[in-house]
């Protein structure tokens, strides 16, 4: 099965700040209309950390082997996800032996990829759900909560 994960945050600056984030899972099963699942949350963190947190939350929903393509405006996360095996080989440490930034999130993502035998790819830039996700994050004012939003949320598309 082919699954696309679309990531978005409400702020794209690099500073550590409170921000909203979200993901859309889009599963392609044969010729059927894609099935989507949505999750939103909020946390204090950097742009990269919140994108990784959204990806982590999306991957929790996976239980079997599949192909996953991650779409995000975060070019760093898109590039590094392709090198996750290299990061794991160094135990998520830099050349000085110190843990890389967001090591906990990278380790969790790597564990899930291995556990489910996920074949991963990534694209950086604006994506199909960017505008919709930004609108949803604005609608909810200051408090997005954590994880999946209620059934009353409008569906993407």
Locate predicted features:
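RNase H catalytic domain
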Residues: 9-15, 55, 59-135
